Amino acid sequence: LLKLDNKINIIYRNYKEKNDKVEIENIVKFCKKNKRKIFISNHLKIALNHDFNGLYIPAFNKNLNFKNISLKKKFKIIGSAHNLKEIRIKEKQGCEEIFISPLFKIIKKKGFLNISRFNYLCSLTKKNIVALGGINEKNFNQLHSVNSSGFASISWIKKNRPIIK
């Protein structure tokens, strides 16, 4: 993580095990020390109690109880979606930024959006959109054609640890 540009934010996702309080505190402390924003997936109470920068709401979470909660000043809610119906849910959940995926072909999923469908979905919302899914060194230059405020990659960043200037 130290090699990554500090503009790269971290989303802590732990769907399999019970959350370890010490591990969470260490991750938050590490990110704050290195001036990196840290979000936690699906756990609003933990996010607020442990000074996370925000909450990430995955596409499968359709709960609408997030919007009317009083949050600290710079706390940010972000989410992910795969289609227009999920984008509308993320808007109702109060997400400031929405990750739309998959932009390019990925192994885990049968279909993908492609640039024109992705841009069409982006045009249907006023929220900041982040491109996600299948982004790698072969298609990285195609991101110039995408109407998004940024991009996210899991496997490419893990594999290459790019330092973005």
Language-model-derived ranges and their functions:
Residues 23-40, 67-83, 111-134:
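Alpha-helix-loop-beta-strand connector modules within alpha/beta enzyme cores
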Residues 13, 82, 103:
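Histidine-centered beta-alpha loop that forms part of the nucleotide-sugar donor binding/catalytic region
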Residues 55-68, 99-111, 134-165:
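Glycine-rich phosphate-binding active-site loops on the catalytic face of alpha/beta enzymes
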Residues 1, 38-57, 82-94, 123-130, ...:
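Catalytic cores of alpha/beta
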Residues 6-70:
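N-terminal active-site wall of soluble small-molecule enzyme domains
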Residues 3, 16, 36, 75, ...:
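Inter-domain helical "communication" segments and dimerization helices
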Residues 7-10, 52-56, 72-77, 94-97, ...:
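Active-site regions of enzymes building and remodeling cell-envelope glycoconjugates
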Residues 1-6, 30, 69-72, 91-92, ...:
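Acidic (Asp/Glu)-rich catalytic clusters
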